[in-house]
Amino acid sequence: MATYVQTNVGLYWGGYSLASSFNAIALHLSNSPQDDTVYGDTTVSNASGLSTVTLEAEGFWQSTTDAVLQASLGSNEVISVTPVDQSAGSPSIFSKYTTSSYNPIAKGEVGSMMGFSLSAEGRGEKSVSGEILVIPATYTTSSESSTNASIGAVSATQSVYSALHVTAASGTLDVIVESAPSNWSGEATRITHTQFTAVGAEMKSAAGAITDAYWRVKWTVSGGGSFDFISSLGII
């Protein structure tokens, strides 16, 4: 199993790419077990409780990043972290969060960099460990699709999740997620994202069972415009 040194982490916060302002990101996944021990048990028993997703991060203050983070306080955002790089097939961890705290001047001493810190809490969605299908770039072609990816089937107890971050917009953008039983024929549309005409983000899902193992993202740019976006897919 490969290990990585953090040098090219990506952070997509709603409709913004903010990694260049950050120098530390931590994701915490937990569960709140509930004691269900009864007479006759010889050891403590716990039932699975509610799951929790938390993001904590810090970095160096910049006015443009500060404006985004202040506006997001108390609001819901789709956040994706790409812990290795932003290549197709690289890991992407995403979920919906509510920004619970933002400290624009978390630390600052004479002669040192002015730093900020923040925390965000999960907004009713599990954390999805997926992979990047569409790399962050500028797309102008009227209709394109990502390289087909063998991500696997979706069982009856699972769902497939798609995270889309649009960081620059001109015209209209329509994005769908397709699956196919082979590489590539017999495709079916599984997820249809809301049409984008401005920067923003969206996380959508489709419930299983889906027996297809191959997946791709397909998009159409209309109105003579161009869009910068990144798209990730995961199954949990």
Protein language model regions, located:
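Solvent-exposed edge beta-strands and adjacent loop segments
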Residues: 1-58, 62, 90-121, 126-131, ...
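Short conserved beta-strand and strand-loop elements enriched in small hydrophobics
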Residues: 9-11, 76-89
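Extended, low-complexity, turn-rich repeat/linker tracts enriched in Gly/Pro/Ser/Thr and Asp/Glu
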Residues: 63-66, 165-173, 184, 222-227
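Noncatalytic modules at the cell exterior or secretory-pathway interfaces
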Residues: 113-115, 157-162, 208-228
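Edge beta-strands of jelly-roll/beta-sandwich modules across compartments, strongly enriched
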Residues: 116, 129-131, 223-236
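Extracellular and analogous surface-interaction loops
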Residues: 147-158, 166-168, 205-210
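Beta-strand signatures of extracellular beta-sandwich domains
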Residues: 174-178
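Solvent-exposed serine/threonine-rich low-complexity stretches and specific carbohydrate-binding patches
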Residues: 188-198
